[in-house]
Amino acid sequence: SWQALWGHPELLDRTLGWYETVEPVAREIARRQGFDGVRWMKMTDPSGTEAPSNVGSFLIWQQPHFIYLAELVYRANPSDEVIKKYNHLVQETAKFMYSFATYDDFHGRFILKGAIPAQETLRAATTINPPFELSYWHYAMNVAQQWRERAGEKRNLEWDEMIDKLSPLAYNEDSLYLAAENAVDTYKDIRFTSDHMAVLGSVGILPMNKLIRAD
């Protein structure tokens, strides 16, 4: 994203063609796993083939990247040309994000589970609602809806429901946000504080949102 942020959006625009090239691979990954849309890979070769890893295939924090990057290009050149060029993949990216989220009937909310968070120290089988991923989901789904409106399409009401009911970030009795909702020992277990600063990224990299307490 540095290209657009440092005044060279044309360089970023040139790189986004890779996503079109590997779309069939990403679509097949999503289909094989029972999801809609396209699931973007974390570690790949130039053709989109996933690199061997017991972590990479469980990561989801890279999924919203395309929406974020396309939005940077649009901000630099807010035109119908950009919308026509990238809206298809923006929507396909969001389709996966919606289908990946699980509705928690008991609490009346959407949750993110079955993923390894960005700091890569938590287990996919037990992790619920990692904070950076929640914030990124909230941001990117909102942007995807804006792209629908820019393209003259109606907002997806199911997506709006997910945005409205996405789980807030979990915190402990000291009002400190957790590495995941289930990671109650975040500030006692070095596994949770020895890698990527995912909690800070939730509102440091991403804008403030309603999942985070204003106080």
Summary of predicted features, one role per range:
Residues 27-41, 99-116, 173-184:
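Glycine- and aromatic-rich loop/turn segments at beta-sheet edges
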Residues 92-147:
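Acidic/histidine-rich catalytic neighborhood
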Residues 1-28, 32, 55, 59-76, ...:
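Active-site core of glycosidic bond-cleaving carbohydrate-active enzymes
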Residues 22, 41-47, 88-93, 206:
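Short charge-dense sequence patches
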Residues 28-34, 48-61, 96-108, 127, ...:
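Phosphate-binding glycine-rich loops and adjacent basic patches that engage nucleotide phosphates
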Residues 40-58, 113-130:
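Acidic/His metal-coordination segments adjacent to aromatic residues that form catalytic metal sites
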Residues 1, 22-26, 75-81, 86-95, ...:
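Primarily short, surface-exposed interaction patches in extracytoplasmic proteins
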